């Protein structure tokens, strides 16, 4: 709907490494808007507070450098889960 109306989508993410990876995969698949030869860069707003489920849940967590993040590669969302940390939070 946003693309059909030439509206830019900027996802907001708050939560775990899994949500971060899913949001990045979504962002990577959004079309460029506005439709031009010089599209706006993709933007993502996300929480930077301390959160072990975002920074330690994935064995290779998403990090940013100079305002840029790398989209995880690999099967599914591209994450390998830190099962030791996960078991710490399991009920």
Model-derived features: positions:
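Shared catalytic-loop signature of beta/alpha-barrel
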Residues: 1-68
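C-terminal extensions of enzymes
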Residues: 51-91
